[in-house]
Amino acid sequence: MIRIEGIQKQYGRGSAAVRVLRDVSLRVETGELVSIMGSSGSGKSTLLNILGILDDYDQGAYYLDDKLIRNLSEREAAHYRNRLIGFVFQSFNLLGFKSAEENVALPLYYQGVSRRARNKLAREYLERVGLGHRAEHLPAELSGGERQRVAVARALITKPKLLLADEPTGALDTATSYQLMDLLREINQQGMTVVVVTHEHDIAEMTSRTIRLKDGRVEAADPERAAQEPGA
């Protein structure tokens, strides 16, 4: 699903240049649930932006679903994002003046789906994340955990092959965080590839494999846990 080979990324030039990613190579197979861990400044946010086709890289190669992602136009990048990737963010990124159902339906609006069809699908996806009864509520009327579930439903409605979750539990309490991770694991068990960026060790432990970044390099890919997995 994801293959990264020798990725390098820096910001700025000359003496002001900051190297953020240094020869990063990794793979994520179809159907995996993987976490990427690292402290502030480790490069994990930059790596996520590259995975999500929100930023380019300077050297190396990134293959997503066997397609080389490199020097794409804005239109091409948007095409692959919309077709292949669903996003979940720490801050939810919901529109406050639209209901939960309308927020979930929004990606389909941009795909030209009719109002009736997209609202029907949005209700189905809210049911899937346990929030069908909250479909008409505004984000301000929902708890943090409910808002994040709405965000997950919105990410899933376009039927992406890859779900990228950037610190999805960062704004949630412990119990709600674990409930959200249970939902992501359930989604993964249904066949979707899920990558979770986190700085929380307990959240990373709920994934099948952890890739650790330090100073822009892959420090480890959790070999001990990998060895415990079936077939390892």
Stretches with model-predicted labels:
Residues 1-10, 220-232:
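ABC-family P-loop ATPase nucleotide-binding domain
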Residues 2-213:
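ABC family nucleotide-binding domain
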Residues 210-223:
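H-loop (His-switch) and adjacent beta-strand-loop-beta switch element
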